[in-house]
Amino acid sequence: MTDGILPFMEQVKGLGYLIKLDTNGSYPERLQTVITKGLVDYAAMDVKNTAAGYAETIGLPEAPLTQIRESISFLKEGRIPYEFRTTVVREFHSSDDIREIAAELSGASVWYLQPFRDAPEVPRKGLHAPDQMTMEEFGSIGNRFIQTIIRN
């Protein structure tokens, strides 16, 4: 979450609008603040991969895993409606990865799996969506731990 978002959210809430927050979970203290202050009505958090695959998936040398786990734990407390979601990329996600992510999210309300969609603005070239059968298999694996929905 960018600096300065808090006053903006307060202004938007003051106008009577509902706020959905999309986050990658890197700033759990900011997430906790805006939710505790009643500024967020719904949160959606991207969970990119397992701990071992996270940095590669996000294209950085390191991933803020401690912060991401803290955000996951906080959202799982259920103070507001929320969802977790993973964009599934054939080159980054295996059945074992999906099982591990699902186990970590166990106890959460819902996890959406969505296939990767290539676009000109995607900085990394050569990535692919899994086929529909693989997505369904991944959904079945996820459902052993958490309600898992395939979003196309």
Describe the predicted segments one by one.
Residues S71-Y82, F138-I150:
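A structural motif corresponding to the C-terminal end of an alpha-helix
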